[in-house]
Regions:
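N-terminal amphipathic/basic-hydrophobic helices that include classical n-h-c signal peptides
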Residues: 1-36
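Short loop/turn segments that flank or connect secondary-structure elements
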Residues: 28-76, 80-239
């Protein structure tokens, strides 16, 4: 008796859909967790930088006495656009998110002022008005020197004269007022140190970041976000 041979048909084995869905959700969760952990680490490191700079500011404030006239409601340094790096931008966005959780109306006010500023400034913005990144080079620097010098910062509350994101303000804001050394020498706010001699001003010099921690953190932030280059406050607070 001859046996009839049947050709075996391969059975395509597929993982059950619920199992695949679980695997996908787990992978997404792990990815999101890693992103959040990296972001938290960056925020923690930035907090260390802020503490270092604020400690230096407290020290120079004590040494300067009445020569340093910075006070709530003094807004001269809040007028005029200035470049900020991606570490500053990250800190500002985090501060705006925190304000959103406690005072959503005030946060929306910041966003509205930022959007209005972009609408006014985009036509002459010395960079990419879509990404908000400033152009680099001597010509770009020359154009920026004449750009938005009378534009108030979107974080400035026009009713109170206070900064809505004071604890998250950029490094430029944190060191404006006391004597700080740059490539051009020792600079000081024109409202401060009236009557002080050059020697007295030099004795109050602020050294905000002696180990240049900011550069190290900026490199990490740019690698994490994939965005490099400077922007202005309005572009990082508009959305």
């Amino acid at each position: 008796m001859r046996l009839r041979r049947f050709r075996e048909t391969p059975v395509k084995r597929e993982l059950p859909y619920p199992y695949l869905a679980t695997v996908i959700r787990s992978a997404i969760w792990l990815y999101d967790t890693k992103i959040l952990m990296r972001r938290d680490f960056l925020a923690s490191d930035d907090h260390v930088l802020v503490q270092i700079v604020d400690t230096a500011l407290a020290d120079v404030t004590h040494r300067s006495g009445e020569w340093l006239v910075c006070r709530p409601g003094c807004t001269q340094c809040c007028i005029g656009a200035f470049p900020i790096n991606q570490l500053d931008a990250m800190r500002l966005r985090r501060g705006l998110a925190e304000l959103e959780s406690t005072a959503p109306a005030r946060a929306e006010g910041v966003r509205a002022r930022a959007r209005d500023a972009i609408a006014r400034l985009s036509a002459e913005f010395p960079g990419d008005p879509v990404s908000g990144l400033l152009d680099e080079g001597d010509e770009a620097s020359r154009r920026f020197s004449d750009f938005a010098n009378d534009e108030p910062c979107p974080a400035l509350d026009p009713a109170t004269g206070n900064c809505e994101l004071y604890e998250s303000r950029p490094m430029t804001c944190r060191v404006f007022g006391p004597p700080v050394r740059s490539e051009d020498g020792l600079g000081v706010c024109e409202l401060c140190f009236h009557g002080a001699t050059d020697k007295e001003i030099a004795a109050c010099e602020m050294k905000p970041d002696p180990d240049d921690l900011e550069s190290t953190l900026l490199e990490k932030v740019e690698k994490f976000t994939g965005t490099r280059g400077n922007t202005i406050v309005a572009f990082c607070l508009a959305s």
